[in-house]
Amino acid sequence: MSLLVIGINHTSASVDLREKVAFSPEKLTKALDELKNSDAIQSGVILSTCNRTEIYCEVKHGISSGYVINWLAEFHHVALEILMPSIYIHEEQAAVKHLMRVSCGLDSLVLGEPQILGQVKKAFADAREHNAVEGTIEKLFQQDFSVAKRVRTETNIGGNAVSVAYAACTLARQIFESLSDSTVLLVGAGETIELVAKHLDDSGCKRLIVANRTRERAMGLAEQFNAEVISLPEIPEHLPKADIIISSTASPLPIIGKGMVESALKLRKHQPMLFVDIAVPRDIEGEVAELNDAYLYSVDDLQSIIDHNIEQRKIEAIQAEAIVSEESAEFMTWIRSRQAVNSIRQYRENSEAMRIELLQKSMQALASGQNPEKVLAELSNKLTNKLIHAPTLAMQQAAKNGETEKLTVIRTTIGLDN
């Protein structure tokens, strides 16, 4: 048996090719059934996300990566010559290390992103549900989850915001001690604002107001995060209630002006307000920054935070890579020890079968009245010849091929150099 990973990802393949070899839920069920019933694959897990498709498997003796690649191409009806240039292959410890790097976010488009671990866990759960995993692969994934947890615990690789949405929320958390006591006004209802809302919700934000041009789009967010919905013209009325304002619309002109904020601050008795403008062009007039107790950050300010945090993640990644190298080596040690146990068991079983076979023949000879001394002598000779046959052939072959090291190992193994 040997461990194998074959796959494509955002660095090796185009979006078009990644889409062609992605596994929908229906395709995944069929694929896992095929893996489970394959004569060549002992156990396997399929990881399929928007950025990667990878097959982690334990293949039987004599099976190469080409078998799995051919299967992938045939399954998705993609020509091999189109698929091959984008395929990467990892075997044995390299396969173990690759899985651990993936789960720790070290191989992600966004370094250190945590979502991939959940996707790996789901891929493993799907494979288990279809009885496609066992033995070494099952142990590998269980160990992988422990390694990912260790990396998150011992490093800060996921602790620095590297997306605009997350950076905006991080900034809010840094300025306001508790988001659970703050009111947040979100202006817009697009994908970025939806991500912001999710991060705020995860951070314990309880009071959320969503302002949008169309109420229908905002209602989806409101239902998801228990938010209040207002229209854009209603912003001046609700602005004094907001401690944090995060805006991202496609408006060609600013939505929130200096005068509007000035009025809100008076009604708030100049309690501080944080404005985070992540729209291009800007949603909030730059002059707002001139007001006391109004703190305005633009998308450029956030980008400088993100750039700094990316560098911090790269530093943390060095320690994470060291942990992965250590853990992958330890896992291979476990595999080798398991292989040794299996080899020892097989050797003992073969020897026992040989002993029983010769003993039965000797018992039959004794029962037929043959001389006991002669029977015992023949038994000992045959047993000796059978036991030394394989080592003798191996030493002869090693000597013939000039394999000095192999010859030394055999001599040590059979006790000649003890």
Curated annotation (Swiss-Prot):
Query: Which terms under GO biological process does the entry name?
Result: protoporphyrinogen IX biosynthetic process from glutamate
* Subunit composition and interactions: Homodimer.
Catalytic residues identified in the record: C50
Q: Does the keyword Chaperone apply?
A: no
- Domain note for this entry? Possesses an unusual extended V-shaped dimeric structure with each monomer consisting of three distinct domains arranged along a curved 'spinal' alpha-helix. The N-terminal catalytic domain specifically recognizes the glutamate moiety of the substrate. The second domain is the NADPH-binding domain, and the third C-terminal domain is responsible for dimerization.
User: Which pathway or pathways does this protein act in?
Assistant: Porphyrin-containing compound metabolism; protoporphyrin-IX biosynthesis; 5-aminolevulinate from L-glutamyl-tRNA(Glu): step 1/2
Q: Which Pfam families match?
A: GlutR_dimer, GlutR_N, Shikimate_DH
- The entry marks the following residues as binding NADP(+), namely G188, A189, G190, E191, T192, I193
Instruction: Extract the CDD domains matched here.
Output: NAD_bind_Glutamyl_tRNA_reduct
Q: Name one GO molecular function term.
A: NADP binding
Kindly list the residues the record flags as site (Important for activity): H98
The molecule here is called Glutamyl-tRNA reductase
Q: Which family does it belong to?
A: Belongs to the glutamyl-tRNA reductase family.
Top-level taxon of origin: Bacteria
Entry keyword Oxidoreductase = yes
Report which gene this protein is encoded by. Answer: hemA
List the catalytic activities from the record.
(S)-4-amino-5-oxopentanoate + tRNA(Glu) + NADP(+) = L-glutamyl-tRNA(Glu) + NADPH + H(+)
- Annotated function: Catalyzes the NADPH-dependent reduction of glutamyl-tRNA(Glu) to glutamate 1-semialdehyde (GSA).
Identify the InterPro entries for this entry.
4pyrrol_synth_GluRdtase, 4pyrrol_synth_GluRdtase_dimer, 4pyrrol_synth_GluRdtase_N, GluRdtase_CS, GluRdtase_dimer_dom_sf, GluRdtase_N_sf, NAD(P)-bd_dom_sf, Shikm_DH/Glu-tRNA_Rdtase
Q: Which organism is it from?
A: Aliivibrio fischeri (strain MJ11) (Vibrio fischeri)
The EC number(s) attached to this protein equal 1.2.1.70
Keyword set, alphabetical order: NADP, Oxidoreductase, Porphyrin biosynthesis
